């Protein structure tokens, strides 16, 4: 039972919720029933049919409407006396600035992507407002508390490559291939070959309620005398053509997004496919055989080959024809199986056609099968548990019970007989570039990299800045904003196409850049290190190690040793004789000619990194290591052995002894897999405690 003090704190609190999806619906309900009376909600998404099975505040009549607005209206029906304000907008919009965040006592996150989470984290730091972060994936979940100066911020620990991928509004605005896979697998395949009575988002073509649902249903119904190929073309034109055109009618949706391209079969396929192949007649497989395939008749043999739009369209039609010709008895009862060759071919083709429409890179059958076979569906119960934990931590924040703050993990299997694992929050990471003043180090080829590379790949992608400003000394090299005149915009755009060493204020080895984001009120320093060796040695450093020995006949040798890290390579050079200069040795490597000097031994060892190889030889470092106070190794080696992970269920251990607790047991980390979240709301950032102390970050 809450004390009078708790009730007063709850009643008078002004709370900001970011996200009104799976966690958000549960959270808003729990906040309202717990006594909170002033709640603001931000969410840019609209309601989809696929949301209805777990986002209980929404009904079928709400499909296409704002999640934030409908959630508000639903809660006000049973708590009419409280104040709830909704915003159907992107939290990164300029109106949600630091001053906007300062009005709240606590911010509660139920977001689905890293970019938005980082943005909210920085605004909370700038506004000095506590943040309660959360996420779920399947049966796993986590809730963390972030208080400026007292606990680590959301970005104090580096986030490993995502093991789960959020599928944001897969039916309307896909941005990744996995979104297209989920659409093809859970919507289109299920609609055509699964339970006909199960509603999904393909039943709704637009937000126009005047459109006939019966007309839409008729598209998916095949009459007995309808030619299979014509039926396939009808489905093709509906889902890839008319549905896309209907989506384009909503101008607000595409205001800041790339507009998709409607695709019709007549523009891609020949008039008739009957003469092109006769697979439905010549196929000798038995009815129901999972190995029936559309590929042989189309001359497609390699599953790792990337199909173009025409090939994907042919596979789409041919696979659909084979389902009706060879597996008709199964239609109406089929579910996707990654071992069903024809199902995988159909889903791959459909996903690739949709990806082509939305400007997303295509994938091979082999790649698509791997993605489609690792779908992790959302669990409503996990969302409810996490929402309750968020409210518990929010109440502690309002009471300022710092000693009682907990980071809580919801586990799939009991650990020490517990499914909920609470631990004390971590101290701020002194090496964090977001909540501390740690300078960054950027190793880059200043003569071959342009300012655009720095802005796009480092400042925006890696540092997550939205409105960056870049200064070198007193020279302003780049800035964005609505208040710039045309001349300034032209000058900054011209700078983007210049190499770093050729800018008005050249960026060279040893240059120190100041990078700021005025919207996030974030500023950091970047020390630039020019990567000279990568210009010449990269082409020859292809093997793991090699040894070159030249004739050694001269006395009085001296040794010069150079150890560097270049593109993941530890390089040791031992030179003999004083007149063997570095330049002459490099000339030998470039031309292939042997020098007449006594000795050259070159040892090369490739280091292993968890992140993907960076483009253009850029490496950003200086902010990724965990603080020594949390027990992480301070070694600079990337090949260090993994540190042991200590779990604490009671939170009684000192902060200096704790480790990052994984959401899953250590045994579950033995096999690295990529999980794909099939829903569109509340994705948990799975953090591997064995990987948080890496020194280098590879630029994606």
Curated annotation (Swiss-Prot):
Disruption phenotype: Embryonic lethal. Keywords: Acetylation, ATP-binding, Metal-binding, Nucleotide-binding, Nucleus, Phosphoprotein, Transferase, Ubl conjugation pathway, Zinc. The active site is at 168 (glycyl thioester intermediate). GO terms for biological process: embryo development ending in seed dormancy; protein sumoylation. Pathway: Protein modification; protein sumoylation. It is found in: Nucleus. Its main location: nucleus. Residues 200-224, 614-700 are annotated as: Disordered. Its EC number is 2.3.2.-. The modification N-acetylalanine is found at residue 2. One of its GO terms (molecular function) is metal ion binding. GO terms for cellular component: nucleus; plasmodesma. Residues 200-213, 623-653 have a biased composition (Polar residues). Zn(2+) binds at residues 153, 156, 432, 435. Residues 661-674 have a biased composition (Basic and acidic residues). ATP binds at residues 19-24, 43, 51-54, 67, 112-117. Residues 675-685 have a biased composition (Acidic residues). InterPro entries: ThiF/MoeB/HesA (IPR045886), ThiF_NAD_FAD-bd (IPR000594), UAE_UbL_dom (IPR028077), Ub-E1_IAD_1 (IPR042449), Ub_act_enz_dom_a_sf (IPR023318), UBA_E1_SCCH (IPR019572), Ubiquitin-activating_enz (IPR035985). The modification Phosphoserine is found at residue 678. Belongs to the ubiquitin-activating E1 family. The dimeric enzyme acts as an E1 ligase for SUMO1 and SUMO2. It mediates ATP-dependent activation of SUMO proteins and formation of a thioester with a conserved cysteine residue on SAE2. Heterodimer of SAE1A or SAE1B and SAE2. The complex binds SUMO proteins via SAE2. This is SUMO-activating enzyme subunit 2. It comes from Arabidopsis thaliana (Mouse-ear cress).
């Amino acid at each position: 039972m809450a004390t009078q003090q708790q009730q007063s704190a709850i009643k008078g609190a002004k709370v900001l919720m970011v996200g009104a999806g799976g966690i958000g619906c549960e959270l808003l309900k729990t906040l309202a029933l717990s006594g909170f009376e002033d709640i603001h909600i931000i969410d840019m998404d609209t309601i989809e049919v696929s949301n209805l099975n777990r986002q209980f505040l929404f009904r079928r009549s709400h499909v296409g409407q704002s999640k934030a607005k409908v959630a508000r209206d639903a809660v006000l029906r049973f708590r009419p006396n409280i104040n709830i304000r909704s915003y159907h907008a992107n939290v990164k919009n300029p109106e949600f600035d630091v001053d906007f965040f300062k009005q709240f006592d606590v911010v509660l996150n139920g977001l689905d992507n890293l970019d938005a989470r980082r943005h909210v984290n920085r605004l909370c730091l700038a506004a000095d407002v506590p943040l309660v972060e959360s996420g779920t994936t399947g049966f796993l979940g986590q809730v963390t508390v972030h208080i400026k100066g007292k606990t680590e911020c959301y970005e104090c620990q580096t986030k490993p490559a995502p093991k789960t991928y959020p599928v944001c509004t897969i039916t309307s605005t896909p941005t990744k291939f996995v979104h297209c896979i989920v659409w093809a697998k859970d919507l289109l395949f299920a609609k055509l070959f699964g339970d006909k009575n199960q509603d999904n988002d393909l039943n709704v073509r637009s937000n126009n309620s005047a459109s006939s649902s019966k007309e839409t249903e008729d598209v998916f119904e095949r009459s007995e005398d309808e030619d299979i190929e014509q039926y396939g073309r009808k489905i093709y034109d509906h889902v890839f053509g008319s549905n896309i055109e209907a989506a384009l009618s909503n101008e607000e949706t595409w205001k800041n997004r790339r507009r998709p391209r409607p695709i019709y079969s007549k523009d891609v396929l020949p008039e008739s496919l009957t003469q092109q192949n006769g697979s439905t007649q010549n196929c000798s497989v038995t009815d129901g055989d999972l190995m029936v395939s559309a590929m042989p008749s189309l001359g497609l043999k390699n599953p790792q080959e990337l199909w173009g739009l025409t090939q994907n369209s042919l596979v789409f039609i041919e696979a659909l024809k084979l389902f009706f010709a060879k597996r008709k008895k199964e239609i109406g009862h089929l579910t996707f199986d990654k071992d069903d060759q024809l199902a995988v071919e159909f889903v791959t083709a459909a996903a690739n056609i949709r990806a082509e429409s939305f400007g997303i890179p295509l994938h091979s059958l082999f790649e698509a099968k791997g993605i489609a076979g690792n779908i992790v569906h959302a669990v409503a119960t996990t969302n409810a548990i996490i929402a309750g934990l968020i409210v518990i931590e929010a109440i502690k924040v309002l009471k300022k019970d710092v000693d009682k703050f907990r980071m809580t993990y919801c586990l799939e299997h009991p650990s020490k007989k517990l499914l909920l694992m609470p631990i004390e929050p971590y101290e701020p990471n002194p090496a964090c570039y977001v909540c501390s003043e740690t300078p960054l180090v950027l190793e880059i080829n200043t003569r071959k990299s342009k300012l655009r590379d720095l802005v796009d790949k480092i400042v925006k992608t890696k540092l997550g800045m939205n409105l960056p400003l870049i200064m070198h000394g007193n020279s302003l090299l780049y800035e964005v904003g609505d208040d710039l005149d045309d001349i300034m915009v032209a000058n900054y755009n011209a700078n983007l196409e210049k190499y770093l060493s050729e800018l008005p204020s050249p960026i060279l080895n040893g240059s120190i850049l100041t990078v700021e984001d005025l919207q996030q009120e974030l500023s950091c320093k970047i020390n630039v290190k020019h990567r000279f060796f990568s210009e010449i040695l990269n082409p020859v450093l292809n093997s793991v190690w090699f040894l070159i020995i030249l004739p050694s006949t001269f006395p009085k040798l001296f040794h010069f040793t150079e150890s560097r890290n270049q593109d993941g390579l530890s390089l040791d050079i031992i030179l003999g004789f004083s007149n063997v200069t570095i330049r002459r040795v490099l000339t030998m490597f470039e031309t292939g000619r042997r020098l007449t000097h006594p000795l050259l031994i070159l040892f090369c060892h490739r280091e292993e990194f968890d992140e993907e190889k960076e483009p253009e030889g850029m490496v950003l470092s200086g902010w990724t290591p965990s603080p020594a106070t949390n027990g992480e190794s301070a070694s600079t080696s990337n090949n260090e052995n993994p540190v042991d992970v200590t779990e604490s269920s009671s939170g009684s251990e000192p902060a200096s002894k704790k480790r990052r607790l994984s959401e899953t047991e250590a045994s579950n980390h033995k096999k690295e897999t990529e999980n794909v979240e099939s829903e569109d709301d509340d994705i948990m950032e799975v953090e591997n405690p064995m990987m948080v102390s890496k020194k280098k970050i590879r630029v994606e």
